[in-house]
Amino acid sequence: MGAMGVNFLAGDIGGTKTILALVTINESSPGLARPVTLFEQTYSSPAFPDLVPMVQQFRQEAAFVLGNPISVAKACFAIAGPVIDNTCRLTNLDWHLSGDRLAQELAIAQVDLINDFAAVGYGILGLGSEDLTVLQAAPVDPSGAIAILGAGTGLGQCYVIPQGQGRYRVFASEGAHGDFAPRSPLEWQLLEYLKKKYSLGRISIERVVSGMGIAMIYEFLRHQYPERESAQFSKLYQTWNREKDQETKTVDLAAAVSQAALEGTDVLADQAMELFLGAYGAEAGNLALKLLPRGGLYVAGGIAPKIIPLLEKGSFMQGFSDKGRMQSLMGTIPVQVVLNAKVGLIGAAVCAAQS
């Protein structure tokens, strides 16, 4: 594939912050080589009018720290937004990015833009055992498909297919917009509550399995069981509800609910996370049934690493495995949680090396 120690520029671009990294990959290694970071820096995205001056500053800083300018073979940037024909207009930032324009202005032979969750798909390939927690151990087939889903602000899904000779291809998915399928009387009541709240005829799984989903589940439960709500959470909820349409917020209800469930200090929070984890696991199982990911199913996103003890308690894996006649099949699929918060940045580097 090329000489040893080829250098790439990788970036994880968000509306608030951008992480840039100069990485090297030994392309002569057999199989997929993991990227090694030479220099990394985090910037405030709104502080720059465009990505170009940010990258120029980054390269100057890298040259100063490393002692000399480093040539870059290719670049790949993971972006929180839709990427069409290697272009993207960021939702929360007045940037319109084009891979061709960036390549020309930065004097880099090739610049690829990819969606941030597609970057997570590539990033899985660059992780080590220290970056993962096992929820279900099973033999991994190196030639098998890999499935990834991750709840955070929304619910991302994608899958990875090996192409042979240490190369992989990531495919995006909009599976999170599939229907939420209730499995219990309480989940049916949750569905009807959300349909009425949003004036919709259907509810997507993302409205339940996401950070906002946790908040909505708690809101539903306090509506169903007002006598179970503690005075502390009643006050938190009222503040959150008052501020939710404001730019400045002082309460993150989803974080408060999950933390209380971790500490076992609130009955309604415990129940909310049980509902959330059951639905999360069920959707992970649905994805696994569709893809049969013998290469593993990975739970990514911002929520999972923060609630490992809850994931290990059983509701998630019970929802995953409870597939009727297919239950024994579900036990053959490796399931792991991604702990490394920089998986998207790693993925951008892996993508650059493969493109």
From Swiss-Prot:
Pfam entry (one): Glucokinase
Compartments, as annotated in UniProt: Cytoplasm
Gene Ontology process terms (BP): glycolytic process
Keyword Calcium: no
GO molecular-function terms, A-Z: ATP binding; D-glucose binding; glucokinase activity
Coiled coil start-end: none
Protein's name in the database: Glucokinase
Species whose genome carries this gene: Synechocystis sp. (strain ATCC 27184 / PCC 6803 / Kazusa)
